[in-house]
Amino acid sequence: MADPDSYRSSITSRPAFNRTVTSSTQNYGTPASGNRVLKIVTETHTSSVASGLSPYGQGAASTIRDDREREKKEITELNDRLASYIGKVRFLAAQNRKLEADLNVLQSRFGKSTGSVKIMYEMEITTATNVVKETGKDHEEAEKEIGKIKDQLDELRKKFEEAQKGRAEDRLKIDELLVTLSNLEAEINLLKRRIALLEEEVARLKKENFRLTSELQRVRSELDQETLLRIDNQNKVTTILEEIDFMKRGFETELKDLQAQAARDTTSENREYFKNELMNSIRDIRAEYDRFMAGNRNDLESWSQIRVQEINTQTNRQNAEINHKRDEVKRLHSQVSELKSKHAELAARNGLLEKQLEDLNYQLEDDQRSYEAALNDKDAQVRKLREECQALLVELQMLLDTKQTLDGELKVYRRMLEGNSEENGLRQLVEKVVRTSAINEEVDTETMRVVKGEHSSRTSYQRSAKGNVSIKEVSPEGKFVILENTHRDKEEPLGDWKLKRKIDGKREIVFTFPSDYILHPVQTVKIFARGNGVANPPEVLVFEGDDTFGAGANVQTILYNNSGEERATHMQRQSQQTTTS
């Protein structure tokens, strides 16, 4: 039996065990005492773990089991000693004198032992009461925490609703951008058709220009022909003038002959007559010549002027048309260049709008995943707190049951020691045994009360990321860690990044990426602990610093960049639930 001064209670908060109480009743008859029922209480403990350990670890569970085994042995020893006392009383019935001496020893030893048991159970009751109070405080704190988490959940729901509204607005904006894009595409098609029409017009103008150039060449050839004809006519005029001069010289020669003949004529009348006739003939010839020359000169000058005027007019008109066509061609060229530049600008704007649309879609998907992950994490935390509250309630009920059982056992021991109005206690029983030798025995049936229970553990995971790189998967046994680049076309340099893994807030394991390591878009990298995989960069890396990343009930895996900023996290927690039947 333990010393009551050095006894320490083994009751702690949130014990992870179930109590099975076996109660057996034996009747030990005593001389001249009638029927006496002695209730011996034996405690056994059963604990079936569905998965994992309690949050307090295997060490706490082992300590609780050892304490309960020690208490069970102490109670069993107490029951055995009580039985030996009764046997000794029966043996001392035949030897009254010897029994008197032994009775004094037994009374001293028995009274001391029962006093120790009483002190121990009172300490157990006090400890259990304190544990119940602490559990109640923990329950109140858990309720407050649940209220805070509910507020956070409401805030996240509001943010999610705002995100949904923003998503709807983004969809409207996307629709507007699609309408604008359609209008731009229609305008581009219209401009392409206009450019085609203008190119056809340019081709037509080029043909017309070629035709006008050919016409100009033809007119120039005609002008050359007319010039040659004019020169020919001028040559003809010169020839005619020479003929006239020749005829004039002939006429003058003939006139001189006539004058000579007239000079030979001696009569004045004949000379006057011939002279007059000659003058008249000369005058007529000169007048006729002047008329002929004037007519030819006027006709030639008028015809030349008309032809020159027609050629000049036609040339001016053709030059004006050519200049007009050139201006038109220049205008069309400038318009085509302007349309091409506008087409290039619209094409660039179209590409920019498509890029913005794609970025908005990616951002919308990332925001939606982030909000869904945050809501899932908060729901998981709420469920976990509710499960912990339920487990606390179950443990509180177990403590209350334990307290009631201990109260019942104390009442039994008090009744065994003190007795009641109808029955005698052990003290009176021993006194009567000394004075009588009659022994009556009666055996009652044994009763048993079993409390069965089962512990079930639940593991929850929580992930978060502040960029494109996230922790996709972590082995619960600590064999590997998988990272993923969620971006579709952007590479992520992970040179000198650190992957830290904290085990139950104590042990810390750090893996550092190579300085030139790059994680490609939509790719994963699997990092094995030493001895668990073969290196195959860049898809598979091996951590040579340890043969495991560690395992435990509360594990944090955190990814830091080369500046020490936290970029991604992965939380693993285990919660235990106790069920009784």
Curated annotation (Swiss-Prot):
Q: Which Pfam families match?
A: Filament, LTD
Q: Name one GO molecular function term.
A: structural constituent of cytoskeleton
Which residue intervals make up region (Linker 12)? 259-276
Give the residue ranges for region: Coil 1B: 121-258
Which InterPro entries does the entry mention? IF_rod_dom (IPR039008), Intermed_filament_ifa/ifb (IPR016451), Lamin_tail_dom (IPR001322), Lamin_tail_dom_sf (IPR036415)
Domain IF rod: residue ranges = 71-424
List the residue ranges of the region (Coil 2).
Answer: 277-424
Q: Where is this region: Disordered?
A: 1-33
GO cellular component terms, semicolon-separated: cytoplasm; intermediate filament; nuclear envelope; nuclear lamina
Tissue spec. comment: Expressed in the embryonic and larval hypodermis. Also expressed in the ventral nerve cord of larvae.
Give all residue intervals belonging to the LTD domain: 457-574
Compositional bias per record (Polar residues), positions renumbered to this chain: 7-33
Family annotation (PROSITE patterns)? IF_ROD_2, LTD
Task: Give the subcellular location.
Answer: Cytoplasm
Region (Tail) spans which residues?
Answer: 425-578
Q: Coil 1A: where is this region?
A: 75-106
Keyword Nucleotide-binding tagged: no
What keywords appear on the UniProt entry? Coiled coil, Cytoplasm, Intermediate filament
Where are the stretches annotated Head?
Answer: 1-74
Q: Which domain of life is it from?
A: Eukaryota
* Region annotation (Linker 1) ranges: 107-120
Q: Can the keyword Cytoplasm be found in this entry's annotation?
A: yes
Q: Which GO terms describe its biological process?
A: heterochromatin formation; nuclear envelope organization; nuclear migration; nuclear pore localization; protein localization to nuclear envelope
Q: What does this protein do?
A: Cytoplasmic intermediate filaments provide mechanical strength to cells. Essential protein, involved in attachment structures in epidermal cells that connect muscles to the external cuticle. Required for epidermal morphogenesis in embryos. Probable component of embryonic epidermal attachment structures.
**Protein name as annotated:** Intermediate filament protein ifa-3
Native species = Caenorhabditis elegans
Taxonomic lineage is: Eukaryota, Metazoa, Ecdysozoa, Nematoda, Chromadorea
**This protein's encoding gene:** ifa-3
